[in-house]
Amino acid sequence: MSAPEKPRERSFPKIEFTDSEAGAKVFPSSKSRSFSYFTPAKLRATMYEDVTVDVQPDPDRHLTQGWIYGFGNGPGGYPKDWTTAKSSNWHAFLDPNEEWNQTIYRNNAAVVRQVELCLKNAKRARVYDGWHTIWLTFIERHVGAWMHAENGLALHVFTSIQRSGPTNMINTAVAVNAAHKMRFAQDLALFNLDLAEATDAFDGSVHRAVWQEAPEWQPTRRVVEELTAVGDWCQLLFATNIVFEQLVGSLFRSELIMQIAARNGDYITPTIVGTGEHDYDRDLNYSRNLFRLLTRDPEHGEANKALFAEWLGIWVPRCLDAARALQPIWSTPADKAVTFASSLKAAKAKFSALLEEIDLDIPEELDK
């Protein structure tokens, strides 16, 4: 009887390190527990910088072989020629508000709770029963009409260009701007529905006809529609946040509604409109920084100033025409706390101060 065969020993290939594994390469800060590909604005990077800077790389930063994605018959990635404005370093822009995905939901949720609580308290206290019919007519016609302007800017201006900028920091700021406008338009719509349910004296559907047919609103509607036809994302941002919002938006919201509502026994509308004004103040903050960066650019600053002057020549006359067409609205309320002349003067003064802050000359059209 033959002896049983011994089991064969299994062999394993010898492990060889090729220095291709993670952590093999040694370089400055390679042993650090944290490493950043960018230089933060301050001593340490903020959460905003960690989640926005270099999230959208380009051939100027890290993509040494060019864009790795793009349409088959078009340019790759995010071309810089999507605007005629120039910058020696688009990545230098950082949103002073430090807005990113989390702050969009957190800040908007806080505003939504504020508006809901305001409307709920108004209905419980039956506030609308004490409002004069003239003031209800003013709200249904003009505040309702402004809702269409906000909605148009949200959907067809800011949403349309939120992926057109050359850096993630610019695109994130514009996306937050779109969220602000969209939420404010929805707040005005909710306010309109609440009033329509609370009192029979309020017509909740007339705002559409006012926006489409009322002569005082047609120049404003025309400007909003002309804005949606602009293909240059930087011009669209400039014309909207720097020109239109100053000469028309703030004129209506801040210099009219916020001034006269309380005198007409209304403390609800200023609360809601005030959220839109607060949003615009934040949006203006990033817009001011962006255009100041472009006008002070060491290589393209003078060319950008000339370009922005051309844009002012296009949009200032249109927005002034829209502003002056709104003049009859100032005589509508029962208690006329302010005049159109004083409101327009205040809006022009703020606009002039803004232009000085971004190193631009005051256009001649502003004094005509």
Curated annotation (Swiss-Prot):
| Signal sequence region | none
Encoded by which gene? mimC
Entry's CDD domains?
AAMH_B
Q: What function does the entry list?
A: Component of the propane 2-monooxygenase multicomponent enzyme system which is involved in the degradation of propane via the O2-dependent hydroxylation of propane. Also involved in the degradation of acetone via the O2-dependent hydroxylation of acetone. Also able to catalyze the oxidation of phenol, methylethylketone (2-butanone), 1-propanol and 2-propanol.
* Induction remark: By acetone. Transcriptionally activated by MimR.
Quote the catalytic activity from the record. propane + NADH + O2 + H(+) = propan-2-ol + NAD(+) + H2O; acetone + NADH + O2 + H(+) = hydroxyacetone + NAD(+) + H2O; butan-2-one + NADH + O2 + H(+) = 1-hydroxy-2-butanone + NAD(+) + H2O; phenol + NADH + O2 + H(+) = hydroquinone + NAD(+) + H2O
Q: Give the record's keywords alphabetically.
A: Monooxygenase, NAD, Oxidoreductase
Name of the protein described by the UniProt record: Propane 2-monooxygenase, hydroxylase component small subunit
Q: Which domain of life is it from?
A: Bacteria
Listed Pfam families: Phenol_Hydrox (PF02332)
* Protein species of origin: Mycolicibacterium goodii (Mycobacterium goodii)
The UniProt GO MF terms for this protein read: oxidoreductase activity, acting on paired donors, with incorporation or reduction of molecular oxygen, NAD(P)H as one donor, and incorporation of one atom of oxygen
Q: Does the keyword Cytoplasm apply?
A: no
Question: What family is this protein classified in?
Answer: Belongs to the TmoE/XamoE family.
- Asked if Oxidoreductase is a keyword of the record, the answer is yes
How does it associate, per the subunit comment? The propane 2-monooxygenase multicomponent enzyme system is composed of an electron transfer component and a monooxygenase component interacting with the effector protein MimD. The electron transfer component is composed of a reductase (MimB), and the monooxygenase component is formed by a large subunit (MimA) and a small subunit (MimC). Requires the presence of the chaperonin-like protein MimG to ensure a productive folding, resulting of a soluble MimC, which leads to the active form of MimABCD.
Q: What is its EC number?
A: 1.14.13.227
